[in-house]
Amino acid sequence: RAGSWIARPICDVNDATSGFFAFRKKLIQSLPEGARGYKIMLELIMAGQGKLNVTEVPIRFNNRQHGTSKLSFSHQWTYLQRLIALAGGTVTVNTASRFALVGFFGVLIDVLIFQLMMRHGAGLGFAHMLGFIVAATFNYSLNSKWAFRQHYDGTLRWRLFSRFLTVSIFALLLRGGILALLVYAWHVPPLLAIFPAIIATATINYFGSAFYVFPDEKHSLSPDIRWRVAAIGVVIFILSLRLVYFGLAQLIPDETYYWQYAQHMDLSFYDHPPMVAWLIWLGTSILGHNEFGVRIGAILCGFIAMSYLYAFAQNLYDKSTAMRAVLIFSILPLGFASGTLMTPDAPLVAAWAATLYYMERALLADRHTAWLGMSIAFGIGILSKYTLGLLGITALLFVILDPTARRWMKRPHPYLAATLALILFSPVIIWNIQNEWASFAFQSTRLLDDGYNFAVHNLIIYMTIMLTPIGLIAAGYALLSSNSPEDDTFVRRRRLFVQVFTGLPLFIFFVLSTFDLPKFHWTGPIWLAIIPTIAWMMTQANHLSPMAKRLKTAWQPTIIICTFAYALILHYLVLGIPGAPYPHSLTKHYYWRETAAEVERIAKSVRNKTGKEPIIVGMSKWSIASALSFYTHESTNLDIRSRNLMGDSGAMYDYWLPSQLSTDRPIIQISMKHTHLDKNRHGDDIRHLLIRPGIIEHRVIERYDVPIRSVYYRVSKGLEEILNF
């Protein structure tokens, strides 16, 4: 069974290792000369390049009762080698042993340089990067001239060198995360942590060299197989990045605010439904109140979204398209961010993908049982974010437009599904009833709070960010494609499904952007419906227009650039990049652990001078107060409030910590801008609310002895009654 499972990614049969099969005799001529092993059926299927019609007839055998299996280790190793060769790799005993020998000397060089740099006071990031660069240069020279000599003539080729450089950079950036995980999270000494980091890097380098740098070019592979192999490699790397870095990178203010949700558990909240709070509460209960505990829910939601997207794409098209769909989703910003950051978008995207899957099963495949799954997914989705309600409107439009799906309007299933989804949504309804419909009122009026703004151009920019330019062009091409006379009924219904479930939500966002500024991430989930079609177009370009062919060519650099960008950003956030400064546009909203430590020192100084416990007031709606609360909750018990203490709005802080009349406890205002210490967001002076306000001071926040930002603060003796304001 294990043999058949590992063969499934590159072929479309369930049991590629079966010894019972029948085929036309002339197909035996298609077998390659280098075919080895005993699984002839696998060789035939791969030689067919996806052009064979294969029918499987299940046969159940009893487990062996007598004797022993003829499979020896040599048989299994031969099978694995052949499987890798069929996938385009050059993994052999010869190349592996030579690569290992070269790698051994590379490890010695790497470790020596790393230890030398660390002993001379270099930072962890600089030491590991310098050691890797020197060792990788040495390894490339010997690998190209010796380890892979039978597949490569040893001369310098810039194309191969650029590929080697790409693989090496990816390995380097992931290695930094592994090293940081071992040192910062698991407290392994750096001189020991470098060894497992090197082993992980060597694994990436070897398989990257075998499949990408020095692939087997003697036997041509179909584009379909090449994309499958690329999908497997890239998705594994993306998942590795998430798993390594998700607990190392500091939380963004939004995540700390939702962590505050979990500290004040309720049926719902003012600005979002409760799902994000429930997931954070569960994660922190298991892993603790740290980045790991907060973000584990996002990681799981990312896996769920990938799984449902794969199944959805396979139902619409085929297995190869499904693998490419997961690849595209993984490298697009909408997929990477939602699977890494613990915001309401994480469960929303997972629920959106699940709802699409069940809606396709119900409306296109006519599966009665899919309505139950749809109701649960839809209910969970609107418990994550109200945006998922758009799928309900979209489903109604599709049922109206599609004659076959219209039959469901006469059946009880849709109405029972809607009832169950409403029951799941009931906690939000109950909370709103108890709080004068505050959340519904906020969501329905927030668009025009800042006045009229024509922002269609902003929406287009945000869509470009979420999809990348190539992804946006491909989505537009897929969305505007029309039916062909040769299309059968299923193809027409499939196209209608994709266009309706993408087009209607997109149209609604375009309408909203004509009079108000949208958030950059609002359109993210709506592209899930069209990603399978984009993935299908990647291998159908020969039958499409010249534009589609150019899009096909552009996907490879897009995948590389996006993957590199994520790895570089994560390494930069955790370990930094030698010589790269910290831009103010980033640091003014990030690195709150260092800022919180400085605020603790300020509070300690005020406490020692006054003998009273100060009140920390973050002069923003919720971001400063939430970030400081998260990064001080273990070390100190500071009394941290939001700007609502000064009479301004504070979102959920209005419910958790409402403003008080007056106090003689010291007030420490904290802000990233000094103007926010004097005036509120409307421009009104707030200094008369303070008792004997001091001068505005600032502290420079450093990270690895590098200045990253300034924090402004003012200490006052107390607070007057807000009613006088």
Predicted regions and their residues:
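Conserved catalytic loops of nucleotide-sugar-dependent glycosyltransferases that act on lipid-linked
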Residues: R1-V93
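Short helix- or helix-capping micro-motifs
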Residues: V235, A325-P333, F378, I382
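Transmembrane-lumen/periplasm boundary regions of multi-pass, lipid-linked membrane glycan transferases
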Residues: L241, L391-R495, F501-D516
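Transmembrane-helix motifs of polytopic, lipid-linked glycan transferases
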Residues: I296-L316, A354, Y358
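Luminal/periplasmic acceptor-recognition loop/helix of membrane-associated glycosyltransferases
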Residues: Y308, L586-F725
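Membrane-interface transmembrane helices that cradle and orient dolichyl/undecaprenyl
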Residues: Q314-S320, T355-W371, A478
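Short acidic/glycine- and proline-prone juxtamembrane loop motifs at membrane-interface regions
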Residues: L334, T340-L348
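Signature aromatic-anchored transmembrane alpha helix within multi-pass, membrane-resident enzymes
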Residues: Q540-G576
